[in-house]
Amino acid sequence: PDCFVDSWSMHLTGKNNFRYEIATTVPYKGNRVDKPKPKHLAFLRDYLVKEWGASISEGQEADDTIAIEATKLGDNCVIVSLDKDLDQIVGWHYNFVKHLGYYIKPEEALVKLYTQMLTGDAADNIKGLFRVGPVKAAKILGDTTDELELYNKVLEAYEGNAERVLENAQLLFLRRYEGQIWTPPQT
């Protein structure tokens, strides 16, 4: 079916990011230090800001500003991105390479975050548990969709290392409102 867009926004990550201060186990995005930036990145960013009205996120990543905006708009928003991290946000999503639209339910978003807490995120140098990929993470979490139960299963998998669970969760969690930092669920 045809779809119409009333408005849209584009977000780019700025230079500062609170996650660099949270990461103590290994440097956040430390695996990218020696990798050169694409040759025309600065020109492209400038063009997107000037010609397309892209906004630059300062102090947080573009993923956070997208998540905040999507949370405010609810089902009146479609997140268009290839970034799997955004699948922890409830709502409509669209993968423009696969031409695939899908809806993430609240319980799916929650499980996505806790799965990442187990697997880590190699792209951002967030170390998960050794030899735990999506399949093993799914076995650890089972059919659980209750956040406290998910947290307890992750904590058990980390052999009670609450500090490491907290660090990974705070690195992986995308903000739903400005300044938000993930905290463990309360009993």
Which residues are covered by each model-predicted region?
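Extended two-metal-dependent nuclease catalytic cores across DNA- and RNA-processing enzymes
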Residues: 3-5, 29-186
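A short secondary-structure junction motif
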Residues: 17-30, 177
